[in-house]
Curated annotation (Swiss-Prot):
Residues 1-17 have a biased composition (Low complexity). This is Probable calcium-binding protein CML25. Keywords: Calcium, Metal-binding, Repeat. Ca(2+) 3 binds at residues 155, 157, 159, 161, 166. CDD domains: EFh. GO terms for molecular function: calcium ion binding.
Amino acid sequence: MFNKNQGSNGGSSSNVGIGADSPYLQKARSGKTEIRELEAVFKKFDVNGDGKISSKELGAIMTSLGHEVPEEELEKAITEIDRKGDGYINFEEFVELNTKGMDQNDVLENLKDAFSVYDIDGNGSISAEELHEVLRSLGDECSIAECRKMIGGVDKDGDGTIDFEEFKIMMTMGSRRDNVMGGGPR
Protein backbone atom coordinates (compact mmCIF):
# COMPACT_ATOMS: atom_id res chain seq x y z
CA MET A 1 0.00 0.00 0.00
CA PHE A 2 2.84 2.35 0.77
CA ASN A 3 4.79 4.00 -2.01
CA LYS A 4 8.23 2.46 -2.21
CA ASN A 5 9.76 5.74 -3.45
CA GLN A 6 9.24 7.59 -0.20
CA GLY A 7 11.98 9.33 1.68
CA SER A 8 12.19 11.13 4.96
CA ASN A 9 12.33 14.89 4.91
CA GLY A 10 12.09 16.50 8.32
CA GLY A 11 9.55 19.14 9.10
CA SER A 12 6.53 19.47 11.25
CA SER A 13 2.90 18.86 10.73
CA SER A 14 -0.24 19.59 12.61
CA ASN A 15 -2.67 17.01 13.91
CA VAL A 16 -5.43 19.63 13.96
CA GLY A 17 -6.62 18.60 10.52
CA ILE A 18 -5.13 18.78 7.09
CA GLY A 19 -2.79 21.69 6.41
CA ALA A 20 -4.05 23.38 3.25
CA ASP A 21 -0.51 24.49 2.41
CA SER A 22 0.95 20.98 2.41
CA PRO A 23 2.46 20.35 -1.03
CA TYR A 24 1.51 16.70 -0.77
CA LEU A 25 -2.12 17.46 0.00
CA GLN A 26 -2.20 20.03 -2.80
CA LYS A 27 -0.86 17.39 -5.18
CA ALA A 28 -3.42 14.87 -3.94
CA ARG A 29 -6.19 17.44 -4.31
CA SER A 30 -5.39 17.68 -8.00
CA GLY A 31 -7.62 14.61 -8.08
CA LYS A 32 -10.42 14.92 -5.50
CA THR A 33 -11.15 11.24 -5.88
CA GLU A 34 -7.56 10.40 -4.97
CA ILE A 35 -7.67 12.30 -1.68
CA ARG A 36 -11.00 10.65 -0.79
CA GLU A 37 -9.50 7.27 -1.62
CA LEU A 38 -6.49 8.00 0.58
CA GLU A 39 -8.77 9.14 3.38
CA ALA A 40 -10.79 5.93 3.11
CA VAL A 41 -7.64 3.80 3.15
CA PHE A 42 -6.31 5.80 6.13
CA LYS A 43 -9.55 5.05 7.99
CA LYS A 44 -9.09 1.34 7.28
CA PHE A 45 -5.58 1.49 8.78
CA ASP A 46 -6.79 3.61 11.71
CA VAL A 47 -8.77 0.77 13.27
CA ASN A 48 -9.54 2.55 16.57
CA GLY A 49 -10.53 5.79 14.84
CA ASP A 50 -8.22 8.10 16.79
CA GLY A 51 -6.95 9.91 13.68
CA LYS A 52 -3.51 8.31 13.66
CA ILE A 53 -1.93 4.99 12.77
CA SER A 54 0.03 3.18 15.48
CA SER A 55 2.67 0.51 14.97
CA LYS A 56 0.10 -2.05 16.17
CA GLU A 57 -2.42 -0.94 13.52
CA LEU A 58 0.29 -0.93 10.85
CA GLY A 59 1.30 -4.44 11.93
CA ALA A 60 -2.29 -5.69 11.65
CA ILE A 61 -2.54 -4.37 8.09
CA MET A 62 0.80 -5.90 7.12
CA THR A 63 -0.25 -9.24 8.62
CA SER A 64 -3.53 -9.14 6.68
CA LEU A 65 -1.47 -8.61 3.52
CA GLY A 66 0.57 -11.72 4.38
CA HIS A 67 3.65 -9.96 5.78
CA GLU A 68 4.72 -10.72 9.35
CA VAL A 69 6.78 -7.70 10.39
CA PRO A 70 8.58 -7.59 13.76
CA GLU A 71 7.49 -4.80 16.12
CA GLU A 72 10.95 -3.21 15.97
CA GLU A 73 10.69 -2.85 12.18
CA LEU A 74 7.19 -1.42 12.45
CA GLU A 75 8.38 1.16 14.97
CA LYS A 76 11.33 2.03 12.70
CA ALA A 77 8.96 2.48 9.74
CA ILE A 78 6.71 4.73 11.82
CA THR A 79 9.73 6.79 12.92
CA GLU A 80 10.83 7.30 9.29
CA ILE A 81 7.36 8.50 8.26
CA ASP A 82 6.48 10.41 11.45
CA ARG A 83 7.61 13.99 10.76
CA LYS A 84 5.72 15.25 13.81
CA GLY A 85 7.67 12.96 16.13
CA ASP A 86 4.71 11.70 18.17
CA GLY A 87 5.19 8.00 17.35
CA TYR A 88 2.18 7.80 15.02
CA ILE A 89 1.34 8.45 11.37
CA ASN A 90 -1.27 11.20 11.01
CA PHE A 91 -3.33 11.77 7.86
CA GLU A 92 -1.03 14.40 6.35
CA GLU A 93 1.99 12.12 6.81
CA PHE A 94 0.00 9.26 5.28
CA VAL A 95 -0.90 11.37 2.23
CA GLU A 96 2.72 12.45 1.84
CA LEU A 97 3.88 8.86 2.02
CA ASN A 98 1.34 7.69 -0.53
CA THR A 99 1.62 10.53 -3.06
CA LYS A 100 5.37 11.13 -3.32
CA GLY A 101 6.27 10.23 -6.87
CA MET A 102 2.89 8.63 -7.51
CA ASP A 103 0.46 9.12 -10.32
CA GLN A 104 -3.13 7.95 -10.77
CA ASN A 105 -1.92 4.60 -12.12
CA ASP A 106 -0.09 3.97 -8.83
CA VAL A 107 -3.23 4.79 -6.85
CA LEU A 108 -5.25 2.44 -9.07
CA GLU A 109 -2.67 -0.30 -8.50
CA ASN A 110 -2.89 0.22 -4.73
CA LEU A 111 -6.68 -0.12 -4.91
CA LYS A 112 -6.33 -3.30 -6.98
CA ASP A 113 -3.93 -4.69 -4.37
CA ALA A 114 -6.39 -3.83 -1.59
CA PHE A 115 -9.25 -5.42 -3.56
CA SER A 116 -7.27 -8.64 -3.93
CA VAL A 117 -6.79 -8.78 -0.13
CA TYR A 118 -10.57 -8.61 0.40
CA ASP A 119 -11.35 -10.96 -2.51
CA ILE A 120 -10.18 -14.00 -0.56
CA ASP A 121 -11.41 -16.64 -3.02
CA GLY A 122 -10.13 -14.69 -6.05
CA ASN A 123 -13.43 -14.77 -7.94
CA GLY A 124 -13.44 -11.05 -8.77
CA SER A 125 -16.01 -10.02 -6.18
CA ILE A 126 -16.13 -9.47 -2.43
CA SER A 127 -18.87 -11.12 -0.39
CA ALA A 128 -20.07 -9.98 3.02
CA GLU A 129 -18.31 -12.99 4.51
CA GLU A 130 -14.98 -12.04 2.89
CA LEU A 131 -15.35 -8.42 4.00
CA HIS A 132 -16.18 -9.61 7.53
CA GLU A 133 -13.16 -11.92 7.68
CA VAL A 134 -10.68 -9.24 6.56
CA LEU A 135 -12.12 -6.49 8.78
CA ARG A 136 -12.02 -8.81 11.80
CA SER A 137 -8.38 -9.68 11.03
CA LEU A 138 -7.70 -5.93 11.14
CA GLY A 139 -9.32 -5.66 14.57
CA ASP A 140 -12.68 -4.22 13.45
CA GLU A 141 -15.37 -5.98 15.49
CA CYS A 142 -18.15 -5.74 12.92
CA SER A 143 -20.95 -8.22 12.31
CA ILE A 144 -21.90 -10.02 9.10
CA ALA A 145 -25.10 -7.92 9.06
CA GLU A 146 -23.03 -4.72 9.15
CA CYS A 147 -20.85 -6.03 6.31
CA ARG A 148 -23.97 -6.78 4.27
CA LYS A 149 -25.13 -3.19 4.85
CA MET A 150 -21.73 -1.85 3.76
CA ILE A 151 -21.89 -3.90 0.59
CA GLY A 152 -25.54 -3.00 0.01
CA GLY A 153 -24.63 0.68 0.06
CA VAL A 154 -22.48 0.33 -3.07
CA ASP A 155 -23.83 -2.84 -4.71
CA LYS A 156 -25.17 -1.25 -7.90
CA ASP A 157 -26.13 -4.52 -9.60
CA GLY A 158 -27.82 -5.98 -6.51
CA ASP A 159 -25.96 -9.30 -6.56
CA GLY A 160 -24.98 -9.10 -2.88
CA THR A 161 -21.27 -8.75 -3.63
CA ILE A 162 -19.05 -5.91 -4.81
CA ASP A 163 -16.84 -5.97 -7.87
CA PHE A 164 -13.78 -3.75 -8.33
CA GLU A 165 -15.74 -0.74 -9.61
CA GLU A 166 -18.10 -0.94 -6.64
CA PHE A 167 -15.10 -1.41 -4.32
CA LYS A 168 -13.59 1.84 -5.60
CA ILE A 169 -16.87 3.58 -4.74
CA MET A 170 -16.87 1.99 -1.29
CA MET A 171 -13.29 3.12 -0.63
CA THR A 172 -14.05 6.63 -1.86
CA MET A 173 -17.10 6.86 0.40
CA GLY A 174 -15.16 5.50 3.35
CA SER A 175 -18.00 3.00 3.61
CA ARG A 176 -17.34 1.13 6.79
CA ARG A 177 -18.88 0.56 10.16
CA ASP A 178 -19.12 4.35 10.76
CA ASN A 179 -21.30 4.81 7.67
CA VAL A 180 -23.35 1.70 8.41
CA MET A 181 -24.17 2.94 11.87
CA GLY A 182 -25.33 6.28 10.48
CA GLY A 183 -22.35 8.30 11.66
CA GLY A 184 -21.03 9.11 8.21
CA PRO A 185 -17.33 9.55 7.52
CA ARG A 186 -15.18 10.59 10.43
